[in-house]
Amino acid sequence: MNQFKFKVEKEIYDSNLNGRTGVITTPHGEIKTPAFIPVGTKATVKSVLPESMSDLGAQALLANAYHLYLQPGPEIVDEAGGVGKFMNWSGPTFTDSGGFQVLSLGVGFKKVIAMDEDTFRSDEVIADQKERLAHVDNDGVTFKSHLDGSMHRFTPEVSMQVQHQLGADIIFAFDECTTLHNTRKYQEKSLERTRLWAKRCLVEHGRLTRERSSKPYQALWGVLQGAQYEDLRRKAAKDLSALDEDGITFDGFGLGGALDKANLGTIVGWMTDELPRDKPRHLLGIGEPDDLFVGVENGADTFDCVAPSRQARTSAVFTNSGRVNITNAKFNRDFNPIDESCDCYTCKNYTAAYLNHLFRSKEMIGSTLATIHNERFIVRLVERMRTEIESGDFQEFKKDF
């Protein structure tokens, strides 16, 4: 039984913007959108108890299929009752397809990834003297485990099988993630490959849904690529929206691939212009405050990113005045919360001076307290965006932030 639904509630009253609020209904609860989905890559948000994420306002968590496939293995997660039960999280869950991790590890990238290596050799893209761990062909990707060097093969079918075993409420189709530095010719070739992989994902998803009919319904979302090209982004949106394999269609869409920060809103707008209004859109890998504003106003409903927890572990914390490094000397005697307006556990109970001390002393709890703050800050920010859209004050809120 399909227990997945999406309802649009309120749209920004501006002909140039596509922002809206809504509700995603899954077998494990509702997600009020727009919403930020914290990332628990290996079925845990690093340094924070999974069950405590609900106290931070998280409505859902996202885990990574690639990492859970390698360790502990999807069959173990399946036997445990699915990724949510495995990590003691009762709310909705997402898993990504594993495509980004397989492909990015495949070229040993630094800041971005590049599959047509001969086209772009900057050391900002491909790390020097690093072994290529993956090979892409039209059928799938062969890759070497970063854990033990063993060889593996991901195809659209394998990605679906792994994600069905992981048991998340929302799963993503297997796609090829390109970069802004790939040639136009390669982008066209890759876009068609991703479209064909999407068709295969729908077929296998349908088969597995029937085969595992006693399990809660899993919603499959297609992933749009196309880099910085308007025609390719629009084509991807139209193509994936039109796919129908024996009545099986995508329940939502992921806006993926390389996104130029300077043109983020424009690129997201191209895709949301073409996507059906009644299906949710997830902007993959976006979590910086300014990018979230842009994503929301251009029609993205959910977001995920490792940035809040990753940056917290390096002593970087979000504030209403911008991101700061809590180890800076000016915080030595700052006996105020990290952010006076924040309602998180850390800001209610600890001072900036104490976190400064914890990080300088290399105490593990420093990462925990900083992660609690950062995750709550971003979750709450997107919550506030939802409230301001509903009240008609989103643009004023963005201007004042």
Predicted feature locations:
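Non-catalytic, usually N-terminal nucleic-acid engagement modules in DNA/RNA processing proteins
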Residues: 1-213, 329-332
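C-terminal extensions of enzymes
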Residues: 1-23, 31-35, 44-47, 174-182, ...
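Conserved, mostly hydrophobic/aromatic
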Residues: 29, 61, 96, 163, ...
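C-terminal helical cap(s) of enzyme catalytic domains, especially alpha/beta-barrels
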Residues: 74-83, 312-326, 379-382
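Short conserved micro-motifs at the rims of enzyme active sites and ligand-binding pockets
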Residues: 105-107, 337, 358
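A non-catalytic, amphipathic alpha-helix used as a structural packing/dimerization or gating element
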Residues: 158, 162, 166, 189-200, ...
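Glycine- and acidic
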Residues: 179-184, 188, 221, 251-256, ...
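Glycine-rich phosphate/ribose-binding loops and adjacent secondary-structure elements
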Residues: 192-195, 204, 208-210, 215-338
